[in-house]
């Protein structure tokens, strides 16, 4: 490989690394909301999986504890799926044209 080609590859790798960092920083700011029980339980989290808020409608507070726990878990899982989908969309633009093994998720 010629020296010029290697330098070009190094520049591309550095640019991709910078773009990846910017995308990860942006994902830390994007919030998604998961819901369960027709919106009576809501979980808000970032696309980096930091839970920011759990909202439980007051009408559920006197209800069955097991049901409430199930609704919180379902809302969390809904938010997690939305965060993953949003992350994949955002990272796809960064990794476009980059050959990745099947099933490999970014960010690592």
From Swiss-Prot:
Pro residues bias locations: 99-108
Subcellular location: Cytoplasm, Nucleoid
Molecular functions (GO terms): DNA binding
Domain of life: Bacteria
Pfam families in the record: YbaB_DNA_bd (PF02575)
Keyword terms: Cytoplasm, DNA-binding
Primary location recorded for the protein, binned into one broad class: cytoplasm
Subunit structure of this chain's protein: Homodimer.
Identification of the protein by name: Nucleoid-associated protein BP1550
